[in-house]
Swiss-Prot record:
Its EC number is 4.1.1.49. GO terms for molecular function: ATP binding; metal ion binding; phosphoenolpyruvate carboxykinase (ATP) activity. Pathway: Carbohydrate biosynthesis; gluconeogenesis. Gene3D superfamilies: 3.90.228.20, Phosphoenolpyruvate Carboxykinase, domain 1, Phosphoenolpyruvate Carboxykinase, domain 2. This is Phosphoenolpyruvate carboxykinase (ATP). Belongs to the phosphoenolpyruvate carboxykinase (ATP) family. It comes from Shewanella amazonensis (strain ATCC BAA-1098 / SB2B). The gene is pckA.
Length: 513
């Protein structure tokens, strides 16, 4: 930071930040006590504006391309100094936080923000430690200045806004954007780069634990059900989005949740509903004339959000971590209506589907996405956040599955009986019944039937689920049309997978066109 900053609020409380945000006109107080803020034109992540500084220490280990775009060190330093100078005479908010609920693998991070509500977001989503940085590790710095306007020709950015990660300097710079999710995803990308070198698998997943200490992981892209399904009244939540899987443990990388709010209902998502109260930040949620949030209103964006600390969840795992997972669930939202609601995977199939990351962009978190739903392949169920080559993460996944003996399942939260627009989407109670059968261990030894084209093993019965739903061909009125769509999907899988250099055992574990 630049010298001479005045009016610094250091480690401010929730009440202080809410009060300051309201006083400064950054947001409104809602009827349920939450603070609602609007993010302007950017209502999602801006992947085209995200860069990693290209420097000797990390250059060889990063997969450079459209996701990880290089930025020159000298250009970064110049821009960092310009943003620091911009903040030097402003009221700013600073907190000492941590990323990673593990004494060995945490990162200390000092977060400086121009907005009070951004600081509240950071304190909700990162971990507020009892004693900051007990191991005395080098501290990371996040500097977030949404009011700063970048000049692409001068600064080397792609637009007026940017997100830049610098591993050598341990710095993250955010300038020109109000969407707060960029802060959490930046530090997730940092841990995604650092953890594999320590033999820890970083994961874009949610996690919960049962009364008997059995951990379950839920992988999936935004909108596939990670947050909803892990917020289970019968289990204890570890976290809803980012975790590390180390030998002996699964730990949360964060200290809070960032839940999608579109169509949120008390009936279907009681845990999330109850977590939205004083201290929660609502992003781009529209209020009615009595300031009651209208969760059905997508006039600002489909990507409406609630950011709250884990303390807002009654049934949570206090220490923010658990044992290794007995069950691992890959959530896919299949818009073609071809995939079964649940399949059991071998470890090779798990690696195949992990690398494929087949799903749909549902109410996408990325800028420029509309409500239209389209299928996508997102490596490791989170391609935008993984700096290393995909094979690094797939190998670590197979190693952890093999060493611990986890059972992996592919669960379709998308369509059946026809593609999007024709068939119907699996309802949340059906998916919950499937997940209940998975976490109870009932599906581990159940009889299965083989689906040839998809190369998947499907249970013949699942408690609480209509048997007719289990084999997808039975839900289509036109069986020939189903085979046609299944063939098309198998071909898409194969075309996407051709880019991976992996053993034949993994290559052959996917659909057969």
């Amino acid at each position: 930071m630049a010298e001479g900053i005045n009016r610094v609020h250091r480690n401010p409380s929730t009440a202080e930040l809410v009060e300051l945000a309201l006083r400064r006109g950054e947001g409104e107080l809602t009827a349920n006590g939450a603070l609602v803020a609007k993010t302007g034109a950017r209502t999602g992540r801006s992947p085209n504006d995200r860069f990693i500084v290209k420097e000797a220490g990390s250059e060889a280990d990063i997969e450079w391309g459209n996701v990880n775009k290089p930025f020159a060190p000298e250009a970064f330093n110049a821009l960092w100094d310009r943003v620091a100078a911009y903040l030097a005479d402003k009221e700013v908010f600073v907190s000492d936080l941590e990323v990673g609920a593990d004494p060995e693998h945490y990162l200390p991070v000092t977060v400086t923000t121009e907005y009070a509500w951004h600081q509240l977001f950071a304190r909700n989503l990162f971990i507020i430690p009892e004693h900051f940085n007990q191991a005395g590790k080098p501290t990371w710095q996040i500097m977030n200045a949404p009011g700063f306007v970048c000049e692409p020709e001068r600064d080397g950015t792609a637009s007026e806004a940017t997100v830049i990660i610098n591993f050598a300097e341990r710095k993250v710079l955010l300038a020109g954007l109000k969407y707060a999710g960029e802060m959490k995803k930046s530090m997730f990308s940092v841990q995604n780069f650092l953890l594999p070198a320590k033999g820890v698998l970083p994961m874009h997943c949610s996690a919960n634990v049962g009364k008997d200490g059995d951990t379950t992981l839920f992988f999936g892209l935004s909108g596939t059900g990670k947050t909803t399904l892990s917020a289970d009244p019968k289990r204890f939540l570890i976290g809803d989005d980012e975790h590390g899987w180390a030998p002996g443990s699964v730990f949360n990388i964060e200290g809070g949740c960032y839940a999608k709010c579109i169509d949120l209902s008390q009936k279907n998502e009681p845990v999330i509903w109850d977590a939205i109260r004083f201290g929660t930040v609502l992003e781009n949620v529209v209020l009615d004339d009595k300031r009651v949030p209208d969760y059905k209103n997508a006039s600002l964006t489909e990507n409406t959000r609630a950011a709250y600390p884990l303390e807002h969840i009654a049934q949570r795992q206090e220490e923010n971590r658990g044992g290794e997972p007995r069950a691992v669930v890959f959530l896919t939202c299949d818009v073609s209506g071809v995939l079964p609601p649940v399949s059991k995977l071998t470890k090779e199939q798990a690696a195949y589907h992990f690398l494929s990351g087949y799903t749909a962009k549902v109410g996408s978190t990325e800028m420029g996405s509309t409500a239209a739903i389209q299928s996508t392949f997102s490596t490791c169920f989170g391609a935008p956040f993984f700096p290393r080559p995909a094979g690094v993460y797939a190998e670590l996944l197979m190693k952890r599955i093999e060493e611990f003996g986890s059972q992996v399942y592919l669960v379709n939260t998308g369509w059946t009986g026809g593609p999007y627009g024709v068939g119907k989407r699996f309802d949340i109670p059906t998916t919950r019944a499937i997940v209940d059968a998975i976490v109870s261990g009932e599906l581990a030894s159940v009889e299965t039937v083989h689906l040839e084209k998809l190369n998947l093993e499907v249970p013949v019965a699942v408690p609480g689920v209509e048997t007719a739903l289990l084999n997808p061909v039975n839900t289509w009125a036109d069986k020939a049309k189903y085979q046609e769509y299944a063939q098309k999907l198998a071909e898409e899988f194969q075309a996407n997978f051709a880019k991976y250099q992996v053993p034949d055992s993994i290559k052959n574990a996917g659909p057969k066109a």
